[in-house]
Amino acid sequence: VRLLVPAAAAFAYLLTAAALVVWPPLVALTLAVTWPFDRNRAAAGRLLRLCGAFVSRTFPFWRIRIEGRWPAGRQAYVVVANHQSFLDIFLLSNLPREMKWVAKRSLFKIPWVGWCFTMSGDIPVDRGDPASAAAVMARARRYLSRGMSVMMFPEGTRSRDGKLLPFKVGAFKLAVDAGVPVLPIAITGTAQGMPKGSPWVRPSELRVRILDPVPVGAGPGAEAVERLRSEVRRRIASALGERAEG
């Protein structure tokens, strides 16, 4: 029995490596076929998320639970989630809707994986670069205007201990400027399943909890952004069983 866990993990790593080799050509082919009529690159993006979902389910000692439901209808959202681990990307790929991810540019430079992000229309950002931030916001607004949701981690980095970090305002300014609701998501278990800074996985129950959308309130822009930021963080903190400080 003791040999089964490392053997299963080794097999899962092999499947993951195989998926990372096979998927980019499939995403490229999908993009080539659909790009004339798919401005949002929804088909290519959805295929990439299926790869992420596949990877998240290859490891037998991860128990995945999706709680709550994505809201009905075709409304676009600024989707925000707490960030515990690199595993969050794979776990959130199990969600039923395509959305474009805002992620640090270094991820887009990873061979194969980064190419898929680019082909899928995800949005790279250079941290600390105001020009990059402005370009990201403009591109994200275009997606939202075409009915495509945009995914952001408002903490800006992964939490080392799984505790919620302060939220930056970018995602909430985007929602206010675009006039779209925020869809909060609470993640638990990924900090244990793949700790920050480690490529090795551990047994864990991975949970994604989809919370109720938070509408953009009335009032001056800066005040609306701050109210939205505070309310969304409060809801995610409550779902995680934490106090809403920060």
Task: Annotate each predicted stretch with a short phrase.
Residues 1-33, 43-46, 226-246:
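Membrane-interfacial terminal anchoring regions of lipid-handling membrane enzymes
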Residues 3, 134-246:
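Non-catalytic C-terminal accessory region of glycerolipid acyltransferases
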Residues 27-46, 50, 58-59, 72-130:
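Catalytic core of membrane glycerolipid acyltransferases/transacylases, capturing the structured
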Residues 63-64, 124, 150, 182:
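Hydrophobic beta-strand scaffold residues
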Residues 66, 123-126, 216:
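Short acidic-hydrophobic, aromatic-tinged amphipathic segments that line or gate anion-handling sites
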Residues 66, 79, 101, 208-210:
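Generic preference for hydrophobic
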